[in-house]
Amino acid sequence: MMGSRALAHSGDSVNAVPESRSKAVTAFATPTLLAAMLAAATLAGACGTGTSSALGSGNGSGSGGGGDDGGGGFGSGSGGSSSGGPAGFAVGGDSGAGSGRSGDAGVGCDPSCTTAGGKCSGSTCTITENPGNVATATQTQLRGKGTADSAFTWLYPYDNTVFPRGLLSPTLQFGGGESDAEYVHITSKTLDYSGYFAGGAAGAVTLSLSQNSWAAVAAAVGAGDVASVQVTKISGGSVTGPIAESWPIAQGSVRGTVYYETYGSTVAGGRNSVGILKIQPGATTPTAVMIGCGNVCHAASADGTTLAAANTLTTSGAYSLLGDGGVTSLATATNAAFTYMGLYPDGTFGMAATSFGAIYNQNTASRLYSTRTGANIPAAGWDSTITLGGTPAFSPDGKQIAFMHEDENAYTIAKMDFDVSTKTFSGLVDLASESSGTVAWPAFTPDGKTVLFQTGSSTTFETDCQNTGDLYTVDVATQTVRRTDVLDGYSGTGTASYLPANDPGLNFAPTMLAEAVGGYFWAIFTSHRSYGSLLASKANSDGLGVSNCTNPEGDEANGKLWMAAIDIGAPAGQDPSHPAFYLDGQELQADNLRGYWVLPACSNLGVGCGSGDECCSGFCRSESGGALVCVTQPTGCSNVYESCTTSANCCASGDECINSRCAAPPAAQ
């Protein structure tokens, strides 16, 4: 028990969360609203399932310098003469195939440069696009130096945001007066991009690079480099700017599917609708998975095989995600056993969360259940010790479980070790506690060494519409708590924020991608913060942000899914987080939360691949100089994303074996 170390914002000691971060909005609907939504959905008809497409692995391949999924995250490309990967990641000699998923830019331009209409000169890619049909004379003016204007500011993205490859081009958003046209200039060691865009109204200037150009930009920014972005605008013949930001690019593409619950979604049926949707990298809209009948409060297994969810006010169930569309029922329960379940990584069983009694009026104890039969699984060391284990989560390797230890007086995050062969739990350890609020939603990093979790000002965090939330990490071995100030939107270690005035303290319900990608861990969480000018928060009587708790189709900042990079092996005392970015493809009017990013099903031997983690064998290589395919374990060391048992198996010095895959930490910027 760590009652003397309640969570704090100032200093690394753990004290009560300051009042300035203790009043705002949680990411969850009120009990009355959610119960009404569930009841309305139940009365509307039988439980529905969406016509979702089958999970796709999107195998990409590239030859030479860092094909990286051919620009869109799921394509192919060829070109260049150097291996597409960092030192030790060559897979086929000087002219062999490079990884189509995560290779660094090699000698020569990445193929995505020419796909975007760019030109290669040596290793430098030069791209010019003019989607705004800006006149040549105006282009010349925009390239000149303008005057400073404090109102002309970046609203989104945030400075120093780390972007992975394979996602949609972000929507750049700016404050200030109206604009007739904008000029975006992005440079790196091997990139020179120029884009000219149409203007916008005051406070609502938005623009996006073409998807091909964004893919080329992401591919051209290598390890240790950044995309240096400058934006200039012109209005009435007067040029303003430039204003600048820098964006590091992770040397890898995220892949798989994000499953999340939604309220008020058009895809799910409109106002007062509920359901579970999914987004895949590069998709512009979500796809229905399960809609109506109260299908919310879900969890998805890390391997993408299993979904667990509430069905109605009194039932819950487990479902297979391996079909060629929609879901297939596996097991049902007449209580909340599968509601917010902590699923084992392979989805075959899970730990029931403590009952959400205010919504479901159940008294479900935290117990292990099979997702295939619904039967209770006896769990030695747990059944005799834990009754109330809230929001449980297994580590990616399945050897640990973290949960809210609600059997104790204070809300506490605890963890236990787990032996899957005997279904035995042991070694109960309290990791962090909050004396006057809530700590909840623990999620392990892929290496199992750290737990990311949410703090909240209210003990009824799951349904309280006047709750704050910030995210912290705790070291499993030392129980050292660290703030994630940068992710949460704070500047330094104070309470000042780089977000709009209403937005601090609105971050909830984190999960983690189960593998390291591009040298980082990746957190997915719900936030009620503003999304630039496209979705602004409003102030309540306390001057803090308010959620749309009663009107899912209003214009206030509903919960949205955001994503942020977390450093691997950050030094003690250092915030490991980076600024978050909005997960594109969501519906702006919907209230979205609890995103689970799961991996696609692995591919069998001989199937094309981009990296080892796409293969059931764990290895992706070129055979006889041909295309990359899944192969049996070769002799020698393991490349990035290939199988390993220890870090000594990894080819490159400094690479780590994380969740049985070799991972390369990011180079110094």
Regions found by a protein language model. Name each.
Residues 117-608, 631-633, 665-669:
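Sequence signature of WD/YWTD-type beta-propeller architectures
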Residues 6-28, 39-125, 667-669:
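Ser/Thr-rich, Pro/Gly/Ala-heavy low-complexity intrinsically disordered linkers and tails
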Residues 4-6, 445:
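Intrinsically disordered, low-complexity Ser/Thr/Pro-rich tracts
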Residues 29-33:
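Sec-dependent signal peptide hydrophobic core
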Residues 103-116, 121, 601-669:
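Secreted, cysteine-rich disulfide-bonded mini-domains of extracellular proteins
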Residues 11, 18, 34, 67-68, ...:
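Intrinsic disorder/low-complexity signal
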